Amino acid sequence: MLNFTFDKRINMGQATNSILMIRPINFGYNEETADDNHYQNKDSIIKNPNETAQNEFDNMVNNLKQNGISVHVFQDDENDYTPDSIFPNNWVSFHQNGDVGLFPMYAKNRRLERRPEVLEFLESEGFTISNIVDYSSAESENKFLEGTGSMILDRENRIAYCSISNRSNEDLFIEFCEDFEFTPVIFNSFQSVGDKRLPIYHTNVMMCVATCLLYTSPSPRDRTRSRMPSSA
């Protein structure tokens, strides 16, 4: 049995206690994003991916609430075909001062996710939106920056990381950093696809910034000694 002791002095400033989740209605393989998202599997053995996603979604909401996280669920609808709507962090970002970022999306069916009703819902839930910075017009120039999929934000130290790809434009990233007062860190990352090395489509696929809790396991000898009765 493992016994964990958590230091209450740990800074949890990289985490949030309130999140937005979009409950999917058309979740599944997305033809429009598959050309550079090589993690998708068109031949998945899951017969009803949307039903499976909804069940997993509902379980996650319950688990988060049971652990003290405030979850604000917005129900997607069938008016538009949005198979990736469960990932709202790609088109919107929220910031502690009330600023909101809206981002240009690579796939046309993902642009449909960028709905004012979502922000109106959050305001009805008591959130204050003081300023919206909208980068979505860059879609007309085929420039994209898909929110905190493209960028990893170190909110405590005001550093932003971005791995350049079709969905993560360097100029837009620098513009975001200037607008939101982050120091940019730009790099490239790759994955093997067949015999090719191709850019990883989203930075958050390969890195994150979070609070790290480290458990140090005693050596086998120490564990044995702890179970041995003491002798004179």
What kind of region is each of these model predictions?
Residues 79, 104-156, 161-171, 175:
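Intrinsically disordered, low-complexity linker/loop segments enriched in Gly/Pro
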Residues 1-75, 97:
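N-terminal leader/transition segments
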